C-alpha cells in the first residue's frame, strides 16, 4: 500500500483492494436468522488502516479466528504434556503454559524456598529435560505456544528453542508469545529476579534475537491484566500498560533496533472486567495511541 498507485486511492478503495486479496474462511457470514453480514459498516478509518482502531488487518476474523488456547500447567512436565495433548485433541489451536512459583522465580524445585510450591498452580520446569517432557510428541512447527513467564524468560525461551531444534524445527518456524513484561512485575505482580536496568537489557537482547531469528514470535506481551488485578482502575491499567510499552520500544531503539521491524511483534494483554463500556474503550484505545506515538520522530 506504499506505492504511488495506491496513494491515489480513497481509504474505502484501499480497504476493498486489500480485503479482496484476503483468503476468507469457508463459512457463511450471517446472523443466526440468516441475514448476511457485510464485511464492514460505517466510514473510515477502515480495518487495517491507521490508526487501527478497527483492527490490524483488512479482513480481520473473516480470514482467521483468534488462537483458542486454555491456560494450563500443573504437577510435572509429563502431567502437563498429557493436558496439552487433551486440549489439542478437543479443538485447541494453541498452547498456553502456566509455570509454578519456583519456576517463575528462577528457583529449582529442590530449593528450600520452593517447599510446598512445586507443581502448584503451574508446571515445574528445572532443566532442559523437563522442557523435553513438556512438549514431547507435540509438533512445535504447527502449534502456537504462549508462555507466561517473566524473570527467567530468556532461559525458558532458550530451552524451548533447544527442544524444537532437537526435533528438526528451526527458530524461524516457531510461533508464539513469551510474556517477558518485567516492568509490570515491579508494579503489580512482584515476581521479578533482577533489578530494572539489567532486566531491561535482557528484554532488549531478546527483542533483537527474535526480530532477527524468530519472525513469528512475540518477544513481549505488555500486560495490563496484573495491574488491574492489583487494584487499579481501567484508566490506570491503560496508562501503566502504554507507559511500559513505550519504555520497551525506547529501550530497543536505543539498542539499535528499528521499531518498524520489531514493533509489530509486540502484543498486549488486558483485563476483561465487569464494566462493558469501560472495557470497550480499554480495548480500542491503545491502537490509535500506539499508532500516533510510532509516527513521532522520537520513535523512528
Predicted features and spans:
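Recognition helix of helix-turn-helix DNA-binding domains
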Residues: 291
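Conserved small/polar residues in nucleotide/adenosyl-binding loops
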Residues: 283-288
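Hydrophobic alpha-helical segments, chiefly the membrane-spanning helices
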Residues: 294-300
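Catalytic alpha/beta active-site cores
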Residues: 2-279
